[in-house]
Every structure is written in C-alpha cells, then in structure tokens.
Amino acid sequence: MELSETYACVPSTERGRGILISGNSKSDTILYTNGRSVVTLDLNNPLKVSIYGEHAYPATVARYSPNGEWIASGDVSGTVRIWGAYNDHVLKNEFKVLAGRIDDLQWSADGMRIVASGDGKGKSLVRAFMWDSGSNVGEFDGHSRRVLSCAIKPTRPFRIVTCGEDFLVNFYEGPPFKFKLSSREHSNFVNCVRFAPDGSKFITVSSDKKGIIYDGKTCEILGELSSDDGHKGSIYAVSWSPDGKQVLTVSADKSAKIWDISDNGSGSLNTTLNCPGSSGGVDDMLVGCLWQNDHIVTVSLGGTISIFSASDLDKSPFQFSGHMKNVSSLAVLKGNADYILSGSYDGLICKWMLGRGFCGKLQRTQNSQIKCFAAHEEEIVTSGYDNKISRISYKDDQCTNEESIDIGNQPKDLSLAPLSPDLLLVTFESGVVFLRDGKVVSTINLGFIVTALAVTPDGTEAVIGGQDGKLHLYSINGDSLTEEAVLERHRGAISVIRYSPDLSMFASADLNREAVVWDRVSREMKLKNMLYHSARINCLAWSPNSTMVATGSLDTCVIVYEVDKPASSRMTIKGAHLGGVYGLGFADDSHVVSSGEDACIRVWSFTPQ
C-alpha cells in the first residue's frame, strides 16, 4: 500500500500570539508546526507535503539550514532536534537547549551556529550553540521575561538580536556573544525581529502597533514604519522581501501590509493586502507571514493560508485551509465518491476533493464540538458533548439549516438510515433514542451499557454493541426494538459496528484490538482472528464492493483485510497517523482515506492481492 495524497493540517495558532513560519527559497517550500508534527509544504503544490513526527512534545518552530540540507526544530520542552530535510529525515543531533518552550530559532549564515529563544522557566531565556557539538557560544543576559523572537545577522561581523515580553530589544556582539546594549522603544510585547538579507538593517514589530528599523551593525535606531497608514492592532510577524527593500507585516487588524524601506531606514506604506476571510470574526486575524521568492504567504488565526504573488498583487490569492485538531470523523459521500467530509472535535467540518485537496469549510451557525458524525448526500448529523444532536443541511459550502435537538443524555454513537431519511437512532449510556423528523419519538432503556450502533439503510434492523463485548441484534418496528439475537465473541467493549454496502455482512471491532466480520443471515463469523493491532480499534470501513474491511487503531496503523481470505493475508499501513487513526473510509475499491490525531487526512492506494 502506498500514500497517494496528504491533505495537511494547518499551523497551530493561539489567540494573542504570532507564529513564526519559515521556508527554503531554493525548493520553494515552507515549514510550520502543528502538535508534534513539523510540516514541509510546497508552495507551488500544497498536496506535496512531508511530515516529520519524531518530537516527543508539541513542536513550536522549525528552520532550514542555509544550505537547505538540514532542519532544526524546537518544541515546548526546550529540545532542539536537527534532522535531514529530505528522504528519511535522519536525525543528526538532539540538544536540550532551554528549560521551557522554544519560541524562535535561527541558523547563522555559515550554518555552524544556532540561536534559540523562548521561556527559560527561571533559567536562561536565550542560548546560542554549535550545531554539531551543542557547546555554548556566548552569554545572553538582559531579559527578564519570555523571549519571543531572535535573529542572527546574515553577514559578518555576526550579531544577535532578541526581543520579547519585557518590551526590550537586546543586541549582542560576538562570537562568543555578549551583551552590548538594550533598546526600550516599544511599549508592549515585541513579537518578532528580522534582519534584512544583506544584514544592513533589522526590524522589530510589537503589540504596540509599531515597527522600528535599526542599523544592523550598531543597533542605532534609523526610523519607523509610518503610523499614518499603520496597523490598528498588534503586529505579530514581519518578513523582508528578497531584495531587502520592502517588508511584509501582519496584524490582529486582519490586514497584511507591504512597506517600502528607504536607505535611511524610514518605512512608508506601499500596499495593504486584504486576505478575504471566511468567518468575519477573530479567526481572520493574521498571525504569521513569509515573503519567499515571488510568494507572499499569510496565515490567519483560523489556519487559512493565503499565497499572493509579489509580482501581481492585484491577483486574488490562492487560499486553502484544513484542520488544526484531531480529525475524529470522516465520511466519503456515496453519491459523489470524489468528495470527503471530515470533522474535527473543535467543531470544524471540511470538504475535500480527491486529487484537488481542500474545497472549503462548512460555515456552521453553531460551532459546537464534534464527537461523532454521519453524513448522507446533503445532510450531516453530529453529536458533541452537550447532550445535543445537530442536523445540518448543506448545499455547496453553506449550511442552509442547522437545528439542535436535546436528547437529555450524553450521545455515544449515532446512525442514519439513508433510505428512510427521517429516522435517526442515537445511543446513550444505557439505551437508545429514536428521532423522526428532528423530534425525539421514543427513548428505550436496554438494560446494559451501550457503546456502539449501526442501522441498516432501510431502517429495519440495528446492531447495538455493549461494554461487555456482546452484540445485540434488533429488528425495528415503528419506534420500538425487538431483540432477535445476541452474538458473543469480543473480549472488550465494542467500539464500532458497520454494515457492508451489499448488506450481507456486518463488521464489529472492540477496545481489545480485535475485529470480526459476521454473516448477517446465518449470524456466524465470516472472518475471525483479525487481531493484528496492538491497541484499541477506533474506526472501521467497508469497500464499496463489500470484499474488504479496513480498521484503524490507536497504534497508528490501518489494516485492510479481504473477507474471502484468511486474516493473516492482510495489508498494513504502519504509522498512518501520529497519535492514532480516528476516521476511515473507502473512496473506491483501491483507495482508502484515513484521518487521525495529527489533524491530517491521507489517501492510500493499493491493489487487492
């Protein structure tokens, strides 16, 4: 089985803080982080993605070495890992640099030194070290609070500038680096500092809405970005143009601005770029930016990445987005197998198209969390953690109608009957709720702890799984259930049940890592010994032709079984998703779509043996 497409997660963002993305001008790729993943994304083809997931803690920042061969990435534990940018991402070194989170790091132009800054938790807040040995190259005094950004002058004589939450901009000479002077021109957090490509100047931007330009060799103040047309909110990030004559800034006022920087260091506004936002709310605040070759990249708080062309700023930007949190549910739309709907637990539903990637976010009227969902043609049903079921009708990317129904209990699982679209069954801790046309018509207590559910498309039969590992088969008559049989095989609580598309079988899986395929008529096991996961099974899917079953697990693997062959002749994808697989679906008989804890969606192609 091989990976055919990855729809990448978007950068992790935080309200009130900027993110510092970086790139490699030779390969036209950018680097950003989400959770424990470091994502390398091609600006010319966002489907060309590589993900590094070896950090033990959430990664915060990543930078290419000057020659583009190595990447240094830092995480919240203060560790910096240096690894190969290509092929197998071989680890070169790992150093414990700070006692707390790393917020920024930079390579020196000769690729020999790295400076990192962040939160020292009472110890040093900045450290510069040799990239191969980790030995210190200087003392960095002068800061009293978290250091949000650092920069190394790209030309000799080397200089290091740092800035942070104590409103200070500190200047160090070296190597070995030592404190030279401090500037107190800003009156709020200083969020980002960057040197011009020729090293003659550097600029700092701050939450006081100011940008100040300094001499790169002496740290003397040269000028400011003009306040007449300035930002009306905190400035979170700044990036120089490749020729060093302009800078790009992004702000909480939802705009990006390009400034002309004169030789004497004053900045006048050239253009204001308005990134067309989707929400109109705080999610449109811009928190990160990068100017690389002809690409001007901005990132919003909601994770939307906009790519402008620097040579044609009037052209509307190419925009795409995705998930920031665990993608816990996934549905391949049967009527149109090219479309995939995915839901993450923060309440975001995205639409994807095979071969094209991101197609839009569904604009919901209520952004409640999503625990599980079911989709059918133009309707989605979701359940969260607030005892409510939401029925969402959508057309294109717009939700035309969203209604919430309080069922009085915490929903565990839900199932639609597509051929009887007014019927919806929802399980809770001790029973099942019938909903018809958006109203609760009956609540049935089943007398055991319920964990999973599946209903036939015509709404005449249901399988309900229990905490005790038993499968209860019921026939549905009107709004009541009649128990027909109890199947015993599982040794753990049932986690998921699915009927095959031809309705001749159903498959069940449990928290004790076993899956079973059952014949629906004889109620005998059709495929057993599906015991190849090493942790609980979270999700399960059938191929459209009903010959294959795929299972996804907390152990990060996806396993595809052919029903007519022994379980041992399985196909396995190891490490499909960092942190575990939570959503699965078949696009067709040779493509499996998976989603997981890493907020990514992947399409795998295979040939049945």
UniProtKB/Swiss-Prot annotation:
Which PROSITE patterns does the protein's record reference? WD_REPEATS_1, WD_REPEATS_2, WD_REPEATS_REGION
What InterPro entries does this protein's entry cite? N2O_reductase_N, WD40/YVTN_repeat-like_dom_sf, WD40_repeat_CS, WD40_repeat_dom_sf, WD40_rpt
Keywords (alphabetical) are: Actin-binding, Repeat, WD repeat
The record's annotation in Gene3D superfamilies points to: YVTN repeat-like/Quinoprotein amine dehydrogenase
Family matches, as Pfam families: WD40
Tell me the GO molecular function terms. actin binding
Annotated WD repeat ranges: 2-42, 54-93, 97-141, 142-182, 185-224, 230-269, 277-318, 322-362, 445-484, 489-528, 532-571, 576-609
| Expression sites by tissue | Expressed in leaves, stems, flower buds and flowers.
What domain of life does the native source organism fall in? Eukaryota
SUPFAM superfamilies found in the cross-reference section: Nitrous oxide reductase, N-terminal domain, WD40 repeat-like
Q: What does this protein do?
A: Binds actin. Enhances the F-actin depolymerization activity of actin-depolymerizing factor (ADF) proteins.
Quote the protein name from its UniProt record.
Answer: Actin-interacting protein 1-2
